[in-house]
Design a protein with these regions (language model features):
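Short beta-strand-centered interaction patches in the first periplasmic/extracellular domains
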Residues: 1-2, 87-96, 130-194
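Short capping/connector residues at structural and topological boundaries
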Residues: 31-33, 104, 192
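Extracytoplasmic/secreted envelope proteins and their assembly/folding machinery
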Residues: 74, 114-118, 150-154
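Short, well-ordered alpha-helical packing segments
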Residues: 78, 121, 153-157
Length: 194
């Protein structure tokens, strides 16, 4: 078995047109009980005045070793950031931000949960999805008035008595499904971790 020392990871951050490997500190948060995953990127003073990004510009955080980096977060800038201010960080949220900002008002007839969710995701511009294949009894009428997509999915779960979790992973939206784990890391105390 091959062993690598994994003491000090390399960091690469891309936000809008910027790519940074130094002068940044990264905090990434993911929790199955939270709809959003988020990342905070903090800058040293030398970068604070020179960086300017708009709301919803894409951002990526990558970590790794020996110039082999894995993407640990992909998302969008939550608010504009302009150099010269007192802020020293940019907050990114995952694609759930698109669902939060997309408002749905529609009446659905003879519909299943998957059909409503597919419609809502299309309205938000989300194309890659994995929805539960479980068969649910269609409802004759479901009316949605001025709700964001997150609230619509919560309402769907209530109407049908479903407890399906929903989230993004690797840019794909999951509802009642789970992504397959591609890599398994083996950490050994004193060998590759302290």
């Amino acid at each position: 078995m091959e062993s690598e020392e994994l003491f000090y990871p390399e960091i690469s951050v891309a936000i809008g047109s910027y790519a940074l490997q130094k002068g940044v500190e990264v905090e990434v948060y993911s929790d199955q009980n939270s709809y959003f995953d988020w990342a905070k990127i903090r800058f040293t003073p030398q970068f604070q005045e020179n960086i300017s990004v708009k709301k919803k510009e894409p951002g990526t955080v990558m970590l790794g070793y020996n110039r082999v980096l894995d993407t640990v977060f992909e998302g969008y800038v939550t608010g504009p950031y302009s150099g010269g201010g007192y802020m020293d960080e940019i907050v990114l949220k995952d694609k759930m931000l698109l669902l939060e900002e997309t408002i749905i008002s529609n009446t659905f007839l003879d519909v299943t949960p998957q059909e409503i969710i597919s419609y809502c995701l299309a309205q938000a511009g989300v194309t890659e999805t994995k929805l539960s294949a479980e068969i649910y009894q269609p409802r004759s009428v479901v009316s949605i008035a001025q709700k964001n997509v997150i609230a619509v999915i919560k309402e769907i779960n209530t109407i049908w008595g479903i407890k399906n979790k929903f989230f993004f992973s690797g840019g794909i939206f999951y509802w009642g499904e789970k992504p397959e784990q591609e890599k398994i890391y083996n950490f050994e105390y004193g060998v590759n971790i302290i």
